[in-house]
Each structure stands twice: as C-alpha cells, then as structure tokens.
C-alpha cells in the first residue's frame, strides 16, 4: 500500500514553518495516542504515522532528503538500507521517544553508558491543628516505600556474583538501527535499557535491588506553616535502581478548621459576644488568644460588628515578616428567656430610650429610616 505524503499526514502545507508542524503534531498525537484509544488498532497506526512524519519534517537533513526523493529516501535498500516504517521493528515509542517526550514527559537517553534510574518522589498528606501549625511540632509518620535491598545492597545480584555488562548494547542500554541515510537509537531489547544483565539474581529482592517496606520517620514541622505548605525530606523517597540516588519525600500540610479562630495569612480572626448593656455602657471583655486570655476594653456605645486589632497576637510567619495580629469582632447579643420582671424593665427602657422622641439614642435607626423616607419621597415626586 502506498504511503501517505508526510505533509498530508500532519495536515500542513509544504512551506509550513517548524512551529506549525509542531503544533499540528501535538494536536494529532493527543488525538490518536494509544492511551486515549485503547484497543483501537487504527488509532495506533495513525499515531505511529504522525510520529514518523513529525520526526522527518522537523529534522533539517531528513526533511531535505524527503523533499528531494520522497519516501524513496528511506526505503530499505533504496538509499543505504533500513526503513522508517514497517510493522514490528521494536516499539515506536522507543524509536522516536525524544520526539514525543516534550508532550508526555518521555525521551530517550544519550549515547553514553546506561544510568540506573533515580528513585521516585513520594508525597505524604499531614493534617495539623491550628495550634500545632502556629507553634511547630514533631510528628512520627509511617511511609510505605521501596528501600534498598539489605541482602544485596541494591545490586540485585546474589552474594558472590555481580551484574554483567550486556553483550548486545555493551552497557549503553541502547542499540542502533539503520533508517535510510540515518541511524536511530532504540532501547536494548536484551537488558531493557539498563546496560547490565543479572544472571544470578538475589533471592530476597528477585534481582530488583529494592524491596517494599514501611519506613517510620520523625518529621519536624516548623512554626507558622499553613495549608498548602510543603516540606521536603531529601532522600526519603523511593530508593533508586541499583544504587542510583533515592527520591525525596514531600510532606503536604493541611491545617484543620478551628472552633474559635480563622486564619488569613499571619492574622487570626475571632468573634466575641458582649451583652447589649456592656455595648452601651462600656466595660471589659475576656478575649481568647493562642497564648492565653487577655482583656479587651470595650468603649461605650459600641455597635455590633465593630472590629478591634490586638497587635502581635497572631501568627509568626514561617518565612519571616514578623508576627500577625488578632482581629476581634464584637457581636452584641440579644438577651433570651427573660422573666416577666425583665421584660417589664425593658419595656420601660424602650419608652424612655427608644421612642420616636428619643432618636438621638439610636443613630443607626435614625439614619436608616431617614434614608427610607427620602427614598419613597423621591418615588412620589
């Protein structure tokens, strides 16, 4: 079956820029990627076709050869042997891994010695109370992970033996295959890219060099952390392959809601109830802080919702910047479950203080009802 023109495959003109080619490739690769089309062989074929077209058209030398000779430049026996296409010479994800890596994070290694892979990073979600987050705390945690095998010291080989250099790739982890004018690297099928072969594997880790284990760690949480902060423990992630460096452990902080305080940055907020008599006459009210109780002076004629700032009673920031404040909102409480005598006294108070002739005692009401009157007067004009 004749091969489609590479420009047609990507849906671009022959004078398209490299940027346009790359843009078209990304769109089509996402559309036909096997992970999105599991079990669809036609999508897999289109995905491979798109990758090959992109690899040729973004390489100046290959593109020039294709523009001059077309598909014949890469056909087996046509110009140097080897082909770019075909059904089964290895995994196309390995052949063009570096091309596709910018989208899916892949990519092939260079031509040097194969390197063992660094261990994966891990994440641990830690929940703290507000007090723990503000003051700092040490916590013991248990983390399931992969650790270096203590029997073979991570080599994967049985005691008295060692891993042997792969005879196929000579330790490089890759082999070359010819494609027309060009040589393309592919993951070694013998050692799977590791560069070494373990002929006598360790019985404990079965040649992997790592084993599953739950580690117990003591984590020191600095004072002032907040939800979203992340603490890095270097080298406490999964062990690397065959002696490679371990990954890191990231402790993700989440601070639980508090029944009194709310936090915003380094400031704390709370509501404190006061009686309506204290709000009218003034006095002192006890206010909770993270360091204990303190007294707040309430001026006379205080209205509900009034805010007071208590400097230095907030949180000391984990990144510096000083200590925040405690913002106190006073809420005037309406008395409930009154006795007959209390109700009688309030009615007397209402007559002397809150009647129509006593508007000076209720400034908010006077302003409100005056505004309402003006509103309706304007409507009737």
From Swiss-Prot:
One of its GO terms (molecular function) is unfolded protein binding. Zn(2+) 1 binds at residues 149, 152, 202, 205. One of its GO terms (biological process) is response to heat. Zn(2+) 2 binds at residues 166, 169, 188, 191. Binds 2 Zn(2+) ions per monomer. CXXCXGXG motif repeats lie at residues 149-156, 166-173, 188-195, 202-209. A zinc finger (CR-type) spans 136-214. Its main location: cytoplasm. Pfam families: DnaJ (PF00226), DnaJ_C (PF01556), DnaJ_CXXCXGXG (PF00684). It is found in: Cytoplasm. Residues 5-70 form the J domain. Signal peptide: none annotated. One of its GO terms (cellular component) is cytoplasm. Its cofactor is Zn(2+). PROSITE patterns: DNAJ_1 (PS00636), DNAJ_2 (PS50076), ZF_CR (PS51188). Keywords: Chaperone, Cytoplasm, DNA replication, Metal-binding, Repeat, Stress response, Zinc, Zinc-finger. InterPro entries: DnaJ, DnaJ_C, DnaJ_domain, DnaJ_domain_CS, HSP40/DnaJ_pept-bd, HSP_DnaJ_Cys-rich_dom, HSP_DnaJ_Cys-rich_dom_sf, J_dom_sf. Participates actively in the response to hyperosmotic and heat shock by preventing the aggregation of stress-denatured proteins and by disaggregating proteins, also in an autonomous, DnaK-independent fashion. Unfolded proteins bind initially to DnaJ; upon interaction with the DnaJ-bound protein, DnaK hydrolyzes its bound ATP, resulting in the formation of a stable complex. GrpE releases ADP from DnaK; ATP binding to DnaK triggers the release of the substrate protein, thus completing the reaction cycle. Homodimer. The J domain is necessary and sufficient to stimulate DnaK ATPase activity. Zinc center 1 plays an important role in the autonomous, DnaK-independent chaperone activity of DnaJ. Zinc center 2 is essential for interaction with DnaK and for DnaJ activity. Belongs to the DnaJ family. This is Chaperone protein DnaJ. It comes from Vibrio atlanticus (strain LGP32).
